[in-house]
Amino acid sequence: MIFMAYRDFKLAEVVKQFELSLVNARLFEDLVPINSSNWLNETLEISLNFALKSGSEKARSEFIVAPILLEMERINNQNFAIYSGINLDADKDRGLSGECDFILARGAMNYAIQSPIFALVEAKKNDVESGLAQCIAQMFGAQIINLRNHDENSISA
């Protein structure tokens, strides 16, 4: 079998392999928006231009996504941890393996990731379909890890 990673999935492949139906739905329309802090506004004001002009995924991750996740963690009293660039090997035989952009996990930041986990994929520049395929694959990987570790506190990712 040829080794695949999360990033290698194409949308049609992931839909077929995991027997999915794509449905467009408005999931969060009833949520009340919250105001961002002065810190986040100032940080994004400084970093946004640089991140967008650099054109790299890594710069967008470091200068746009990470500050937003840190703000979310602060608002939620550090009740979840943010892990960046961690390998999540859920099921190598099905291609559910490889590096995740971000993993959000229960509890405070620690050396051992606490389940349940949630995989977060950054938008891919000019390629929504590729990012969506990677996101679906990583969410399946996270689901496998969560089910495997249902009765345990920590996982080895």
Feature map (PLM): residue ranges:
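Short, Lys/Arg-enriched N-terminal segments with co-localized hydrophobic residues
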Residues: 1-3
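A short, conserved, highly charged catalytic patch centered on acidic carboxylates
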Residues: 5-6, 12-14, 19-24, 31-155
